[in-house]
Amino acid sequence: RHARAGVVALRRPGSGGDTFEVTMPSDHAHVLGVVVQADGTDAEAAIEAALAAAPAWAALPFDQKAAIFLRAADLIAGPYRATMNAATMLGQGKTVQQAEIDSACELVDFLRYNVAYAQQIMSDQPDNAPGVWNRMEYRPLEGFVYAITPFNFTAIAGNLPAAPALMGKVVLWKPSPKAQFSAQGVMGLFT
């Protein structure tokens, strides 16, 4: 419940009024969608929503956060694989093979590796001397992470905001205007 509230709080379309068309790189007459540009008011609202969601998201046990990212990986690897590949092909002009590597295989790997490596990092603890107990605890940074992602790599665009979110940080994600089609697909898997 907290995770969904946090993600939904941040998934806000712009209300600034300015719009731009998302087109296929190989055919600019083929419009894939129209995006409403965020303005300063939208940015402030997103920051406020992120900061309001931060305590609940940080308090959510790691295993519950990890389950969200592992579920997204399973969805991308399974029933949403073709949709993610198609969005990457249409929006970024990639071939079938390039899209399969980028939006399916690598994004799934990133999400799963992030969980595995985070579990490993958190399980490593400093040595203890007799009569002394040392313990390392991980907690999120203060504030929020602002993730600006590239136009040409769906896997990196999905991973850049996912990694700090897995570790308990709230993230504002600004995907490239040229990658809105696949970014919408990635965000949809988390909501």
Feature locations, PLM:
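Active-site proximal loops enriched in glycine and acidic residues that flank catalytic Cys/His/Asp
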Residues: M24-S26, V35-D39, A86, Q92, ...
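Hydrophobic face of amphipathic alpha-helices that form TPR/SEL1-like repeat modules
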Residues: R1-V34
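Alpha-helical scaffold segments in soluble metabolic enzymes
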Residues: R71, A87, F110-Y113, G185, ...
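Rossmann-like NAD(P) dinucleotide-binding subdomain of oxidoreductase/dehydrogenase enzymes
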Residues: M89, A118-T191
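Long amphipathic alpha-helix in the N-terminal Rossmann-like dinucleotide-binding domain
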Residues: Q37, T41-L51, P55-A56, A66-A82, ...
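Short coil/turn segments at secondary-structure boundaries
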Residues: A3-G16, L60-F69, T83-M89, A99-S103, ...
